[in-house]
Amino acid sequence: MSVSGLKAELKFLASIFDKNHERFRIVSWKLDELHCQFLVPPPPPPPGSSLSPPPPLTLHCNITESYPSSSPIWFVDSDDPNLTSVLERLEDTKNNSSLRQQLKWLICDLCRLYNLPKHLDVEMLDQPLPTGQNGTTEEVTSEEEEEEEMAEDIEDLDHYEMKEEEPINGKKSEDEGIEKENLAILEKIRKTQRQDHLNGAVSGSVQASDRLMKELRDVYRSQSYKAGIYSVELINDSLYDWHVKLHKVDSDSPLHSDLQILKEKEGIEYILLNFSFKDNFPFDPPFVRVVLPVLSGGYVLGGGALCMELLTKQGWSSAYSIESVIMQINATLVKGKARVQFGANKNQYNLARAQQSYNSIVQIHEKNGWYTPPKEDG
């Protein structure tokens, strides 16, 4: 689909579900992303009282470079398994590659989930796109009109160049709040991806690459990253292989004291983690293992794998951000009373052994379930 054709479709959708819609709102959009809200009514209040409406559900949609041949990818900012199931059902509906049909299916399913009647506006999604200058173009600002004229000259640009287009509807740039050196890394990745695409040597999937680029941008602008709690380095510039260094843990924990000693002895003042992502991310979790130092406790298994339900298919949600996963691992190591094993054989941590330990523990927990350790255990 051409840039102008995609833009026309997005404007059509935004004209139906505008920012004041009573049920579903397209808050902002770009050529490769939608930011939407589903408004949930409050439950019936007790007699003589009133309840404030709950916050709206926030949904994101990534539009891939091959749209409409491949379906857009949706995820939701919520841990609610019911909402995750809605998106999984949408993903399983292979015939819904059209953004309009996806929206119709999604809104109807969310209405069923919250026992709401089907909204009449969803029927408008079956209508053909307006032609000419009628309907959706009335609310376009002069800035948007200029962008539209520019778009006509760049219809043949590939996906990665499209992502660099200036945002509309007053939305802040996706790169705002990111330091220059990190912007340079993002730009290098975009250029590499573009060249690989032109050479027919694309690695990974469009879905995973788009989401990982978003996750990396979110990491670079996060306060925890800027405060030096952790750092991220891409191994061989690959979006699918990250080194994450945990520089700061709870200062009252024994692990913090151990890291101070480790710095004095070996010049290492961090815990090095490896995050490995597959083509089906974010629908499957990353594989995470400790690379160094060797730890005891902290739910760290043989080979450096981590015993966390969050990192299994059973406990994972496509809504989870990598930033939150990193911070959860940081907290779990402290909660599990992890300690540095000084003098331990460093070769005992490797990928093959970590995968073996991970697979074994997952099989055990699939049979017996997961549990939360009692407070006296940390």
Curated annotation (Swiss-Prot):
Matching InterPro entries: RWD_dom, UBQ-conjugat_E2_core, UBQ-conjugating_enzyme/RWD
Keyword Transmembrane helix carried by entry: no
UniProt-annotated location(s): Cytoplasm
SMART domains on file: UBCc
Transmembrane segments: none
Annotated Gene3D superfamilies: Ubiquitin Conjugating Enzyme
GO BP of this protein: protein K48-linked ubiquitination
SUPFAM superfamilies recorded: UBC-like
Active site, per annotation: 307 (glycyl thioester intermediate)
Functional pathway: Protein modification; protein ubiquitination
CDD domains assigned: UBCc_UBE2Q
Top EC class, one word: transferase
Domain of life: Eukaryota
A GO MF label: ubiquitin conjugating enzyme activity
UniProt modification remark: Auto-ubiquitinated in vitro.
GO cellular component terms listed in the entry, alphabetical order: cytoplasm
Region annotated Disordered, chain positions: 126-152
Catalytic reaction list: S-ubiquitinyl-[E1 ubiquitin-activating enzyme]-L-cysteine + [E2 ubiquitin-conjugating enzyme]-L-cysteine = [E1 ubiquitin-activating enzyme]-L-cysteine + S-ubiquitinyl-[E2 ubiquitin-conjugating enzyme]-L-cysteine
Family according to the record: Belongs to the ubiquitin-conjugating enzyme family.
Protein name according to UniProt: Ubiquitin-conjugating enzyme E2 Q2
Organism: Mus musculus (Mouse)
